[in-house]
Amino acid sequence: MEALVLLGHGSRLPYSKEIVGKVAEKIKEKNIYDIVEIGMMEFNEPTIPQTINKVIAEGAKKIIIVPVFLAHGNHTKRDIPQILGLIECEEHHHEGEGGHHHHHHHHHGEKIEVPEGVEIIYRDPMGADDRVVDIVLDRAKGN
């Protein structure tokens, strides 16, 4: 069984989760993946660990994770891989970031136990894809 998990940033406002949820619904309708779920980086539930644990419990053997972010950043390069257990958690001292200390609540307390035989595949964010360019041009025209 294959699961697709879309990761959103999350927000104190409802829009981030709503958009990721709508994208997930549209993907579900295509019937490509057995399971399609969303997980939120911060502020909202389901958290990333909640979602991953849920799809594992539902029998997913291959979990494809796509961050619904435009660009790589600290979240996609460090925080999410740490939550997924793909890289070690390090004490992050933001050297060279001008004392930029922001302590997010990243649900680090929750653990993901990945059983034997379950594969987690973590993909890149959207990037400057031509389809993103088309959307920007549509928005510029007021469409």
UniProtKB/Swiss-Prot annotation:
This protein's record includes keyword Lyase: yes
UniProt pathway annotation: Cofactor biosynthesis; adenosylcobalamin biosynthesis; cob(II)yrinate a,c-diamide from sirohydrochlorin (anaerobic route): step 1/10
UniProt: substrate binding residues: 45, 70-75
GO biological processes: anaerobic cobalamin biosynthetic process; methanogenesis
Record's keyword terms, sorted: Cobalamin biosynthesis, Cobalt, Lyase, Metal-binding, Methanogenesis, Nickel
Pfam families: CbiX
Gene Ontology MF terms: cobalt ion binding; nickel cation binding; sirohydrochlorin cobaltochelatase activity
This protein's record includes keyword ATP-binding: no
Superkingdom to which the source organism belongs: Archaea
InterPro entries on file: CbiX-like, SiroHydchlorin_Cochelatase, Sirohydro_Cobaltochel/CbiX
EC number(s) per entry: 4.99.1.3, 4.99.1.11
Residues binding Co(2+): 9, 75
Substrates-to-products reaction catalysed: Co-sirohydrochlorin + 2 H(+) = sirohydrochlorin + Co(2+); Ni-sirohydrochlorin + 2 H(+) = sirohydrochlorin + Ni(2+)
Binding site for Ni(2+): 9, 75
Residue positions of the active site: 9 (proton acceptor)
Purpose: Catalyzes the insertion of Co(2+) into sirohydrochlorin as part of the anaerobic pathway to cobalamin biosynthesis. Involved in the biosynthesis of the unique nickel-containing tetrapyrrole coenzyme F430, the prosthetic group of methyl-coenzyme M reductase (MCR), which plays a key role in methanogenesis and anaerobic methane oxidation. Catalyzes the insertion of Ni(2+) into sirohydrochlorin to yield Ni-sirohydrochlorin.
Annotated family: Belongs to the CbiX family. CbiXS subfamily.
PANTHER family (alphabetical): SIROHYDROCHLORIN FERROCHELATASE, CHLOROPLASTIC
Quaternary assembly: Homotetramer; dimer of dimers.
Name this polypeptide is given: Sirohydrochlorin cobaltochelatase
Species annotation: Methanococcus aeolicus (strain ATCC BAA-1280 / DSM 17508 / OCM 812 / Nankai-3)
Lineage: Archaea, Methanobacteriati, Methanobacteriota, Methanomada group, Methanococci
Gene that this polypeptide is encoded by: cbiX
